[in-house]
């Protein structure tokens, strides 16, 4: 834990933010990182659910995506101002320029990448993904990937999630060990 916190401080980053598509494993990995390093984890979607007292699907249905994105911005900007935490962001939050700018300033960001066909398989079982209702899941994922990938790839590091959270966590530790704290120019794009 101490090495982790020291490295974040030396590169002038307050926390770690996990980015990626819905179903990519951001929350599972963030929980593992938080547990192993004994730091707090926050999930932006869960915070929105707590704040609104409605599920994400219910918010989309009753208030629409525009309202959801407004609340998401407030929640995410508030979360990433905390220190020494891990945050798993909702898949679409990265399209917001204010969120992207705040992440760049304050956080070590990791894009958790997953093959779209694997994502389709994972998400086909889910009933609570409002953007996937009544649509061809793979086509929708391809559309979302086209809109978001350029922002995901602008993260500090990229991790491929092949399915094993333990292996993905070990890859995270490997990435962390490679950060050059004297001259922070780290980019790991696997």
Predicted regions and their residues:
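ATP-dependent small-molecule kinase phosphotransfer cores
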Residues: 43-93, 97-104, 129-130
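Walker A/P-loop
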Residues: 27
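A glycine- and Lys/Arg-enriched "phosphate-lid" helix/loop adjacent to the NTP-binding pocket
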Residues: 106-150
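ATP-binding Walker
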Residues: 24
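NTP-dependent small-molecule kinase module
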Residues: 2-11, 32, 36, 146-190
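Post-Walker A helix-loop "phosphate-sensing" segment adjacent to the P-loop in P-loop NTPases
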Residues: 35-44
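Hydrophobic anchor at the beta1->P-loop junction of P-loop NTPases
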Residues: 18
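P-loop (Walker A) phosphate-binding loop of NTP-binding proteins
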Residues: 21
